[in-house]
């Protein structure tokens, strides 16, 4: 009597999935391309500003004008999106984090500049208040400020 457990080869042999290059590309398990990447960017106030991030070798904080210049290479490489992380000066922070919804805030200006220069580039922004507040806790008292 035939027993499937006694077989020494796989029960499923999907050769048809490997017959042509296009089908192999469609069914392969892992494929990492530029389409899978999001480029994180730390944005600074000012013009022509570039600061290295000491804890992350090779990473820099950029002012909006330099960010727009650098984004040209990202678009050319086919990277579909950037994630903006604003580095807000302490003088612009407050208890309510009002810079988060200020239409002239750093993240908002960077988003507009990138979309004006590269409409096809996705721009992802963080909704956290920590870059905009003087403390990490938001309370009802802060809303009255």
Residue ranges of predicted features:
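Conserved small/polar residues in nucleotide/adenosyl-binding loops
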Residues: 138-143
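Short amphipathic alpha-helices and their capping/turn segments at secondary-structure boundaries
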Residues: 22-32, 68-78, 108-119
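Hydrophobic faces of well-ordered beta-strands that scaffold small-molecule active sites
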Residues: 37-40, 82-84, 123-125
